[in-house]
Amino acid sequence: MSATETKYVPRLYKKYKEEVVPILQKKFNYKSPMQIPRLQKIVVNMGVGEAVQDIRQLERAVEDLRAITGQQPVITRARKSEAGFKLRKGMPIGCKVTLRKERMWDFLDKLISVALPRVKDFKGLSPRSFDGRGNYAFGIAEQIVFPEIDYDKVDRIRGMDIIINTTAETDEEAFWLLSLLGLPIRSM
């Protein structure tokens, strides 16, 4: 890479480094910069229960998830058999993507600025969705809130779970980190 070329830096990562880090450092009195919470990964999971009867449903879900995240999803399989759901161990039942680095920051930016504002009757994310270890999980009921999904080509509405994994020690630290990044979480 020559001196004139600039490396791509995601907009939200730049905001994290320039604005969020100093605020968190001051608020929680961290001694070392390595103590400051940061994002580790974002996992986007789409459970497709209909895949048991119709495998094409899973293929369409994989296509949707690939379009939304820009990364090839991995198919998740049943861990154990469940007669009530006509499910056998090893059957495909969903797909997921683990995003890290630039793709993670780009996805979070798109989620905050485009997808969540398009959710009907959206009043902010619940502050109760923290897990006690600084991670945050929530669900989106419709994949059509993402701009990559063509509304006319959607065969059925599918939801997804989004898990944001941080290095924060407590829920309060994670709340401040995600709120300062712009995630619309209702106050605790």
UniProtKB/Swiss-Prot annotation:
One of its GO terms (cellular component) is cytosolic large ribosomal subunit. Pfam families: Ribosomal_L5, Ribosomal_L5_C. Transmembrane segments: none annotated. InterPro entries: Ribosomal_uL5, Ribosomal_uL5_bac-type, Ribosomal_uL5_C, Ribosomal_uL5_CS, Ribosomal_uL5_dom_sf, Ribosomal_uL5_N. It comes from the Bacteria. GO terms for biological process: translation. GO terms for molecular function: RNA binding; rRNA binding; structural constituent of ribosome; tRNA binding. Keywords: Ribonucleoprotein, Ribosomal protein, RNA-binding, rRNA-binding, tRNA-binding. This is one of the proteins that bind and probably mediate the attachment of the 5S RNA into the large ribosomal subunit, where it forms part of the central protuberance. In the 70S ribosome it contacts protein S13 of the 30S subunit (bridge B1b), connecting the 2 subunits; this bridge is implicated in subunit movement. Contacts the P site tRNA; the 5S rRNA and some of its associated proteins might help stabilize positioning of ribosome-bound tRNAs. NCBIfam families: PRK00010.1. Part of the 50S ribosomal subunit; part of the 5S rRNA/L5/L18/L25 subcomplex. Contacts the 5S rRNA and the P site tRNA. Forms a bridge to the 30S subunit in the 70S ribosome. Belongs to the universal ribosomal protein uL5 family. This is Large ribosomal subunit protein uL5. It comes from Aquifex aeolicus (strain VF5). The lineage of its organism: Bacteria, Pseudomonadati, Aquificota, Aquificia, Aquificales.
